[in-house]
Amino acid sequence: MKVTAVSGTTATLQTAQTWANNDWVFREDSRGNEIMGVQGIVDVTTFVTTLHGISRSTYPEFGGQILDNSGTNRPVTLDLLQQGFLQAEQNGEGEISLGVCTYNLWRKIGNLMAPDRRYTPSMTLAGGFTALDFNSKPIVADRDGPANNFWWLDESSFTRYELADWDFDDTDGSVLHKVSGEAAYEALLYYYAEMACTDPANSVNIRDLSET
């Protein structure tokens, strides 16, 4: 399957495909090889039942804090954000340091804060990025974040393990490799690493939030 064009909401394929609702699309050969993300780490058994070799069915305390609405989207509210914030700190004994959501939810949360803007200024992070200020913690937007989700994260419980840093494959003596049957060359950039979490219960995933 080859993608020939992409817009903000539509991907055009070279040939027609039959997909069903809730099907997933992956970059070729990447499924199962990507770094574990927060959707799998801050989970119970919906997406990842065994994390870092630990079964969450056997050890439920290795699951994240989940606030959902049984699959029915509801509006994001400041009270709901506060509920998730406190649940992570009370039930998981975490120290929340960061909120993450989609751009649509980030915009909606900003609008909810607008009446109190002079009391809740935005925050400027390293690199010049701007974040919303909630309980003196930054909320940032992630362009790759799954829709209808918000995360409160205890960053101190996350770590990244690296086997090899970013590098080009040159095992045959060359970085560029001829593409069979085409007047083209390609290169392979690799990075062997994994995201890990020592205590997923310190973070919370608020699910089923309306993006519209």
Predicted regions and their residues:
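Core alpha/beta structural scaffold of self-assembling particle/tube/pore-forming proteins
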Residues: 1-212
